[in-house]
């Protein structure tokens, strides 16, 4: 049975909340605003897993739903680029997990790279 568009919208909203909950403590540390999360490596691994699963939440048919925050191009003319953004996030999050295991300086450096991937996708595909 195919998922209803409304269910996919809820799924993607949940996936984005999960990413945020895992990322914010790491980003706070990287910015010097919070202590190093003891579970930083696990958080980064969780982010990579979510990034690999996330595209299922952006299936065609969900682009016009109310409360969707994604620009229509992500579903159409730029869908390949949008999917590449998720792949990039999965890659950078995997690197982030390795960096967390290597130490605080490595984590800070990789957090900057991971954050750039997030920012680029939001700038390109998130509605204002």
Swiss-Prot record:
Binds 1 heme c group covalently per subunit. GO terms for cellular component: periplasmic space. The keyword Metal-binding applies. Heme c binds at residues 13, 17, 69-70, 118, 121-122. Pfam families: Cytochrom_C_2. GO terms for biological process: electron transport chain. SUPFAM superfamilies: Cytochromes (SSF47175). This is Cytochrome c'. One of its GO terms (molecular function) is electron transfer activity. Keywords: Electron transport, Heme, Iron, Metal-binding, Transport.
């Amino acid at each position: 049975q195919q998922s209803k568009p409304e269910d996919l919208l809820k799924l993607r909203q949940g996936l984005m909340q999960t990413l945020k909950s895992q990322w914010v403590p790491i980003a706070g540390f990287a910015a010097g605003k919070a202590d190093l999360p003891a579970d930083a490596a696990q958080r980064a691994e969780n982010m990579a897993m979510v990034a690999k699963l996330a595209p299922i939440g952006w299936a065609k048919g969900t682009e016009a739903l109310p409360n969707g925050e994604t620009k229509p191009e992500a579903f159409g003319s730029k869908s390949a680029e949008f999917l590449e953004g998720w792949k990039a996030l999965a890659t950078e999050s995997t690197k982030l997990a390795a960096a967390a295991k290597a130490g605080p300086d490595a984590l800070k450096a990789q957090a900057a790279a991971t954050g750039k991937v997030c920012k680029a996708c939001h700038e390109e595909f998130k509605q204002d």
